[in-house]
A protein has these predicted regions:
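Short alpha-helical transmembrane segments in multi-pass integral membrane proteins
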Residues: 1-23, 77-143, 189-247, 303-368, ...
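N-terminal transmembrane alpha-helices
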Residues: 8-39, 43-44, 57-72, 76, ...
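Transmembrane helical elements of multi-pass membrane transporters/channels
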Residues: 18-37, 137, 171, 204-208, ...
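Helix-terminus/linker motif at the lipid-water interface of multi-pass membrane proteins
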Residues: 28, 32-50, 118-125, 181-194, ...
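Alpha-helical transmembrane segments of multipass membrane proteins
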Residues: 35-39, 116, 150-154, 177-184, ...
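Small-residue hotspots at the loop-to-helix junctions and early N-terminal turns
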Residues: 46-57, 131, 135, 198, ...
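Small-residue-rich hydrophobic transmembrane alpha-helices
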Residues: 49-108, 112, 145-164, 264, ...
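Short runs within selected transmembrane alpha-helices of multi-pass transporters and secretion channels
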Residues: 70, 74, 138-157, 164-172, ...
Length: 458
């Protein structure tokens, strides 16, 4: 390795990997938790698995919107830290917490209205008694999800990505243990089935939020941030600034997740077996998505760091490094799906019909890995430069205008069923990747020197 190559590795590739690996480990814990939930519920009954699929499809839309909203904090914090403005970063956390909690309450209100119309969403009648209590239990956890998300994006923004990793892993262990005890009924605990999975998830999310609050209040190295947090006044202009950075990302992730949510609802129109199959494969496909987003977060942090220093050459080089890293991740995910997919599917369910249909979806799922990894790469690079409005419009065209209608056409008029839904994902994600890349390089050409805001002051 010559000096130039070593410098490129140390300056661009290594930091993304160092930031992304702890996030990836934490996300791997999320994947394992999703696998455990699906496997335990699937072993309990196919109806319970179908009910979980429907509720998770609905809630994933809102959870990803909340996650996207919190993502608006990361580049703001990272940019301020890159300039040594720690007190202002603490103030930005304060505004971000307020915005994220208010946003969560609004989404919970929407979900509460949606609960009144569950029986009109075309789902199999036999799963509705299982859907209702699970829906309410998961809904109660969203405020704690918002609190955890905001605090985690703060620690990620100051390049302490391992903090969120450890808290997520603790939450996963608690959730898996709670699932086993409450789904099947162990010792004095009742056999709650799907509701037990919901209670376990709610409990784990509360504990995760409490741990993050305790860490940020107790660690000495956060003293400067706490001082800025406490001394900053709550100003409407600051809250609106956070919202302008966060809401477009929320809509982008919401529309992306919405394509999967609507597809999940359409899978329910095909029957309980198709819906259960869709849940199995979405859980399996989450392996790639969450890995890509882990390293995508590393790209955002590094891009925002260089953006705060007005170093556009390093912004470009960091993004190029991210492209190669995520392409490698996509190749690894595809090999896991191709060679290990059948083995993993058998772990989710013993229903022969679900297994048979799931096997037909392995290749369509592999097809969309390239588009998924690249749209995440360039979307996160744009996020790092705080040019977030374009993300919203790209998502609207790719997922709402193209993905969902094409999925319907392939699944129903063309008769491809759930396979058609998956093929549509490939089209939507590749289009999104192309448009995000075009917008990023447009920003690079313009340079935007002197036309940005790097934080919120209190």
């Amino acid at each position: 390795m010559n000096a130039t190559t070593a410098n490129t590795w140390n300056r661009y590739y290594r930091p993304i990997l160092q930031l992304g690996v702890p996030i990836a480990i934490g996300q791997l814990g999320v994947i394992i938790m999703g696998f455990a939930d699906t496997m335990m519920v699937g072993r309990f009954s196919t109806d319970a698995l179908a009910a979980a699929s429907f509720v998770n499809a609905v809630f994933n839309l809102f959870v990803y919107m909340m996650l996207g909203y919190s993502y608006g904090l990361t580049p703001l914090i990272s940019s301020l830290v890159g300039q040594g403005r720690r007190a202002e970063a603490g103030g930005t956390l304060k505004y971000g917490l307020i915005c994220n909690l208010v946003f969560a309450l609004l989404l919970m209100l929407i979900l509460g209205v949606g609960y009144c119309f569950i029986d009109r969403m075309g789902q199999p009648a036999e799963i509705l008694p299982l859907v209702r209590p699970y829906y309410l239990t998961i809904g109660a956890s969203l405020l704690f999800v918002a609190l955890f998300n905001a605090l985690r994006q703060f620690t990620d923004g100051i390049s302490e990505t391992s903090t969120g990793m450890w808290v997520i892993l603790v939450g996963n262990v608690l959730n898996i243990a709670g699932n086993f005890v409450l789904i099947y009924g162990v010792g004095p605990f009742p056999r709650l089935g799907l509701l037990g999975a919901g209670v376990s998830t709610l409990t784990a999310r509360i504990i995760m939020a409490v741990i993050m609050v305790a860490l940020l209040l107790g660690r000495k190295r956060y003293a400067a941030y706490r001082q800025g947090f406490c001394q900053s006044a709550v100003r409407t202009a600051s809250l609106l600034y956070i919202n302008r950075q966060s809401f477009p990302i929320s809509l982008q992730m919401g529309m992306e997740s919405g394509a999967f949510t609507v597809s999940g609802i359409m899978a329910g129109w095909l029957g309980a077996v198709d819906l259960a199959t869709y849940q199995v494969m979405i859980t399996l496909g989450g392996l790639g998505f969450l890995l890509y987003y882990s390293f995508g977060s590393g790209i955002t942090i590094r891009v925002a760091h260089f953006y705060g220093q007005n170093d556009w050459s390093s912004v470009r080089s960091t993004t190029r490094a991210g492209v190669f890293i995520l392409l490698g991740m996509a190749a690894i995910s595809s090999m896991i799906f191709y060679f290990g997919g059948e083995f993993i599917i058998h772990g989710f369910t013993s229903d022969p019909a679900v297994i048979s249909l799931s096997l037909t979806l392995i290749l369509p799922m592999i097809l969309y890995q390239l588009g998924d990894s690249m749209q995440i790469c360039f979307a996160n690079a744009l996020r790092g430069t705080s040019h977030v409005m374009a993300m919203m419009w790209v998502a609207f065209v790719s997922y709402v205008v193209v993905n969902i209608p094409v999925g319907y056409l392939l699944a129903f008029p063309c008769g491809l069923g759930v396979v058609g839904l998956y093929l549509a994902f490939s089209i939507g994600l590749i289009l999104a990747a192309s448009l995000f890349a075009w917008n990023f390089y447009k920003v690079m050409r313009i340079g935007c020197i002197g036309k940005r805001g790097n934080g919120v002051t209190g």
